[in-house]
Amino acid sequence: MFAPSRRRVLEAVASSSSSPVVTLPGFLVPAFQQTAGAAARRNFSATTTRPSKLGRTPLSIPPGVEITIGEPFVKRDMTQWKQQPKRKITVQGPLGQLEMDIPDFIKIDHDAEARRATLSVANRDEKEQREMWGTTWAYLNRFIMGVSEGHTAVLRLVGIGYRATIDTRPEKEEYPGQQFVCLKLGFSHPVEMGVPKGMKASTPQPTRILLEGINREQVMTFAADIRRWRVPEPYKGKGIFVNGETIKLKQKKIK
């Protein structure tokens, strides 16, 4: 019925289908030896977790500056469902004292003899801890510099008739001896702004304002509040510039 060659092929297929054992070529065997558990544990990247570049840098503590680390405490906050233990860090120096709260997973190794402080975290693999590692280092570095040297901000008033003076307003002061920055910026009335507590303001020139304080965030926030009255505009270049700020001038559109 079938040719001899076709009959032999059909018999070989029938005999192979009845056999339950299937053998693989030797070059395919290593590819199937990996277990499912090992494949599931394999990460997308095989590189190790890199620590924070800032956080692992030791902080240098100048003479006259002391750092005090408080005990862990839990601050009740109704806006957060998870209560995170924190520690209070106090930095005291010749110019004043600053305090901040840091998470409990950040450890500070303070060497008083070597005048150094090193920061570390409990788990480097967690993203939140890596982020707070460098952020806490930056805040501590600013606090140490603030209580030892202080922070400054210089504002330049550019514009015809723009002037600034430092006066006192006993009827408006929020604390004894508060200074007020009085600005003439082309409005129909002068602008008066009270200097926050812990800061000093002076005018070396009528068009220059010098702000000094130990808290950099407070100094730059008050400088931004003053700048908001006359934001630099790009056509005439007039406005209030902070710390060497520049602006690219635009050409007027001529119809």
UniProtKB/Swiss-Prot annotation:
GO terms for biological process: translation. GO terms for cellular component: mitochondrial large ribosomal subunit. Keywords: Mitochondrion, Ribonucleoprotein, Ribosomal protein. It holds the Pfam family Ribosomal_L6. Coiled coil: none annotated. InterPro entries: Ribosomal_uL6-like (IPR000702), Ribosomal_uL6-like_a/b-dom_sf (IPR036789), Ribosomal_uL6_a/b-dom (IPR020040), Ribosomal_uL6_bac-type (IPR019906), Ribosomal_uL6_CS (IPR002358). Disulfide bonds: none annotated. It comes from the Eukaryota. PROSITE patterns: RIBOSOMAL_L6_1. GO terms for molecular function: rRNA binding; structural constituent of ribosome. Component of the mitochondrial ribosome (mitoribosome), a dedicated translation machinery responsible for the synthesis of mitochondrial genome-encoded proteins, including at least some of the essential transmembrane subunits of the mitochondrial respiratory chain. The mitoribosomes are attached to the mitochondrial inner membrane and translation products are cotranslationally integrated into the membrane. PANTHER family: 60S/50S RIBOSOMAL PROTEIN L6/L9 (PTHR11655), LARGE RIBOSOMAL SUBUNIT PROTEIN UL6M (PTHR11655:SF14). Belongs to the universal ribosomal protein uL6 family. This is Large ribosomal subunit protein uL6m.
